[in-house]
Each structure stands twice: as C-alpha cells, then as structure tokens.
UniProtKB/Swiss-Prot annotation:
Function: Probable protease subunit of the COP9 signalosome complex (CSN), a complex involved in various cellular and developmental processes. The CSN complex is an essential regulator of the ubiquitin (Ubl) conjugation pathway by mediating the deneddylation of the cullin subunits of E3 ligase complexes, leading to modify the Ubl ligase activity. In the complex, it probably acts as the catalytic center that mediates the cleavage of nedd8 from cullins. It however has no metalloprotease activity by itself and requires the other subunits of the CSN complex.
Example of a GO biological process term: positive regulation of DNA-binding transcription factor activity
EC top class, as a word: hydrolase
Protein name: COP9 signalosome complex subunit 5
C-alpha cells in the first residue's frame, strides 16, 4: 500500500532510523563475550563509561505504544539487550503489570514474578539477551529522571549492572511527530560530575522544575540512536499496514488538546512568576545576579512559548493540507 509505505518512511526519517545490513551482525549473541564484559566490569572504573544507547525499531514501537496506551498515567516495562563496548543495545522490551499514577509507577510483587518468568521463557525460545534496563513514561513533562527514578536506577545499577533507564513522553511524541525518548545512567552517591556545560534545552512544567533541578546532576544522558534490520522491516510493514490510517484520520490538535491547554496555563504561570521577580528586583540595588536569573527565566519562557506555537502551527498545517487533498477536489 503506497500510503502505508510513505507514512512508514516519514516516521523512519524523522527518527533517523538506521538499517543494519546483516541480521546476524546485530542479533548474534556471544555468550562468552558478554561474560567477559560482566567479569571485567569496566563501568566501575569509569562512571561515565557508557556513552551510547542503540534501540531496535521493534523495541521502540512496543515502548511507545505501551506508553501511549497509559494516557496520563505512567507505565513501566523492562528491556532486554546486551553490551558492545561503550554502547548499550536494546533488542526487545515488554510491559510490566504495575500500578501507575500521574506522577509515579509502583512495581508490586506480581510484577517481579512476571519479570522473572518472562525472561526465563524468552531464553527457552532462543532470546538469550539479559535484562539491560527499564523504561517508564512521563506523559507531558519531558524525558528526565525524578528523585524516585534516580533512587530506583541507583538501586538497579548497584545490583543489576549493566542497567539503563529509559524515559518516554508519549504526549510530546504525538505533538511533535517525533519520538521523545531519553536514556540515562546515574552516578554513584557522593560523586560530583565535572561541569559538562549546558545540555539540550527541554520544557519542564513549573510544578516539576524543583524535582528536576534537585536531581539533574545525579545522572547523565546517553546518546540514543535507532536501528532496524531486514527482519525488523518485515515486522514494521505488518504494523504500519494496520496503523498507518491513523496518521490521516487523527489530528494532534484534537488528540493533544488537553496537553496544549496545560502548556498555555503553565506558560502563563511562568510569566507571572518572572514578572513578580522583576518587580521585586526593581526595588533592590546591586543585585545583578537576581536580574540575570529573572532574565534567564524569561528567556526560557520565551523558548517554551515558541515550542508550543510551532507545534500548534504544525498541527494546523497538517489539517489544512488534508483538507485541500481530500475535501476540495476540483472537478473539470
């Protein structure tokens, strides 16, 4: 189907999907090599050892679809994969039966039993990869680690190394048309990382800024890339043949109406806060640092405003294009 292939190609280009020529090259599991890596534990000598994270197209789709199914509630799952030098390779993922809220996910005993049974059954059918990380969603508030996430990941790295934490924002994924995903690893307690300069800017809601700021120096982000093999291509074609119509029949303006409204309210609160600080600063003398902080907050609010506006314009443009294509066919 032509429409299906175009939609699939657009999605792959948006997310810089790379194709691996040889299936064996990426799927071959060298047990001896993995055991040698686990025995050497190079990550204990360098707290910034892992720098890259590769995610298979199939694992990516499974995680995004699971995150989207949770709506405004956080969801959680586990990832299977392996290590290749400084790269953590995520081959597959599966959802966990956990209780989710709008701010956290809680794994109960049943989830741990399910996790152990799934990994054991996967090995019986030839999937020899071990658990390499966990993922959860942040619907509408970006990809970063909260205080609870940092504690969970520290515990995982202490007892289940090598382990990576992946965060997906399904709401921003729909709004921007590109997968919003981040992979992170935490530093050991007491470790002070060197100043790495400003990281890539992302919009953080006002009610999450404090939690983000307190813990942002306790972990670092890995460079994420996506790949697919010829086997993945077959599976993706089956998925796209089922879901590609949703691209034409849905609108991000309608699907994410609540999210967009929330963004506008959040922006309003940030501007009011900045205005109040500037007002107080005008009565104080010699407080240049205070002025710089206020200006910095205004600059961030401006960037947030631009991002929200651009996403709304893109949604409107897609609706106009679809209207021109399907509703205004000229008759000759």
């Amino acid at each position: 189907m032509a429409g299906s292939s175009v939609a699939q190609k657009t999605w792959e280009l948006s997310n810089n999907m790379q194709e691996v020529q040889s299936i064996d090259e990426i799927y071959k599991y060298d047990k001896k090599q993995q055991q040698e890596i686990l025995a050497a534990k190079p990550w204990t000598k360098d707290h910034h050892y892992f720098k890259y994270c590769k995610v298979s197209a199939l694992a990516l789709l499974k995680m995004v679809m699971h995150a989207r199914s949770g709506g405004n509630l956080e969801v959680m799952g586990l990832m299977l994969g392996k290590v290749d030098g400084e790269t953590m390779i995520i081959m597959d993922s599966f959802a966990l039966p956990v209780e989710g809220t709008e701010t956290r996910v809680n794994a109960q005993a049943a989830a741990y039993e399910y996790m152990a049974a799934y990994i054991e059954n996967a090995k019986q059918v030839g999937r020899l990869e071990n658990a390499i990380g966990w993922y959860h969603s942040h619907p509408g508030y970006g990809c970063w680690l909260s205080g609870i996430d940092v504690s969970t990941q520290m515990l995982n790295q202490q007892f289940q190394e090598p382990f990576v934490a992946v965060v997906i924002d399904p709401t921003r994924t729909i709004s921007a048309g590109k997968v919003n995903l981040g992979a992170f690893r935490t530093y050991p307690k007491g470790y002070k990382p060197p100043d790495e300069g400003p990281s890539e800017y992302q919009t953080i809601p006002l009610n999450k800024i404090e939690d983000f700021g307190v813990h942002c120096k306790q972990y670092y982000a890995l460079e994420v890339t996506y790949f697919k093999s010829s086997l993945d291509r077959k599976l993706l074609e089956l998925l796209w043949n089922k879901y590609w119509v949703n691209t034409l029949s849905s609108s991000s303006l309608l699907t994410n109406a609540e999210y967009t409204t929330g963004q506008v309210f959040d922006l309003s609160e940030k501007l009011e806060q900045s205005e109040a600080q500037l007002g107080r600063g005008s009565f104080m003398l010699g407080l240049e640092s205070h002025d710089r902080k206020s200006e910095d907050k205004l600059a961030k609010a401006t960037r947030d405003s631009c991002k929200t506006t651009i996403e709304a314009i893109h949604g409107l443009m897609s609706q106009v294009i679809k209207d021109k294509l399907f509703n205004q066919i000229n008759t000759f």
